[in-house]
Amino acid sequence: MKDAQRVLHIRCGDDIKGKLAEAGLAGDYLSFADPAWLGPPPAFNAWLAGRAALIADRSGLPQPKVRAELGEAYWRLARAPADYRHIVLWFEHDLYDQAALVRVLANFAQRTGLPRVELISIDRFRGIKRFIGLGQLTAQQLASLWPKRKRISRRQLALGTRAWAALRALTPEPLEALLASDMRALPFLKAALKRHLQELPWTTDGLSLTERETLAALARGPLTVSELFAETQMKRDPLPFMGDLFFWSVVRDLIEAPRPPVAVSAGTRRSAWHRRMLRLTPTGRALLGGKLDWQMQQPLARWVGGIPAGPGAPDWRWNPRSRHATQLK
């Protein structure tokens, strides 16, 4: 039975849960934190276990905990239209949020008789010079967004469905087709998906944008993982979307590759991961100098949404000149 009184707030994380209560925005809270930009999507019959294993591997969190939380989140998402008369989605402009948003919209698009579903989505806030996300805001600032919520339209549901299918595709071609279409129904989605494609190897050096920013930051001198995260995600990245755990998984792949461009200083190898001191290797300097292509150095296999990257995969690249994905022959 639908609860006529309570609101369900949906967000990709717990960062504003307490603040909403403090602001007097009563209701239940669903943390739908599945990183929808992270692939590949496993077959349906192995979906939950496969998804939990992938997220646990990339985040370093215990797999049983991830599986339990993921299962509950998807169960609650499936039940939400039947259990509530009012649902409010809180998603900012970055890739993590926009990918989660289209996943939620694709889910709701399959339902009939939706309740009132509204969206609060921003890319800036007065007084904050570099707006990263809703988690930066105080309870009072979050409360000021409440009157600006807008009801989800059929166009948004349709665009979310198409975007979710494109994110899961094995090639970037559906994403490119989507980016060439009218995406004004979700005004922050286009930039977020462009940023997603920039995680493909680049035509210039075979590095993703995050990998290149990592090497460039270390070229100035050794940094701890925490310092490196702050430098790349808080300062360098034009549209940051990774939390520290997922950023560490990118760095870890660079460290563990056969010809690593990044190394851990010997004295900190047993330290907690965020305190380990990192330095650039000769391979890293050669990559930054344009003397090597990272895809020719046996990097560890990875996924960009549904697109495989690395040894043996079709060589899809991001071309920074054309600002489109292209396949090298």
Label the model's feature ranges:
Residues G60-Q110:
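Long, hydrophobic/aromatic-enriched structural stretches that serve as scaffold segments
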Residues L119-S144:
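Short, conserved secondary-structure transition motifs
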Residues R212, Q233-G267, G284, K291, ...:
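Charge-enriched amphipathic alpha-helical scaffolds
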Residues E227-Q233:
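A short acidic, leucine-rich amphipathic alpha-helix
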